[in-house]
Amino acid sequence: QVYLAAEIIVATKTHKMHAAWVRAKPEHLAAAELFMDADMAILATPQPRLSEYDAQISREWGQTPGLESFEFCSGRFNALRGFKTAGPVFMTTEFQELDSAAQANIDHLMDFWQHRLTVLNRELVTVAKTASP
């Protein structure tokens, strides 16, 4: 059971179970999908909580919210884009009603991080111009 829990927790990084694990443990797939959907449910929360969650992610990665590095902003945007292009956020019927809210929030977060990248890019260009002779 500990192995099962560990595998499911690791899967939350990509929100996909490894095919070999699914073949070996098909009877646990429903539990794994439910766990991963519960992990993603934060994306369907109201904006204030969503912003708080996003700031927590920045801190988890050693960033100061509002002062994130270009690399972090780019990575965060790309992670969100990955969720967006993967299709529905939720795999289980228990969570599917939250999908439209989660998709809208992903769009909101992508807009936020795209804006941060634009601002940082302008700052980098300004610094580069002032540094050149």
Where do the PLM segments sit?
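Acidic/histidine metal-binding catalytic segments
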Residues: 1-11
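Divalent metal-dependent phosphate-bond-processing catalytic cores, especially two-metal-ion Mg2+/Mn2+ enzymes
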Residues: 14-133
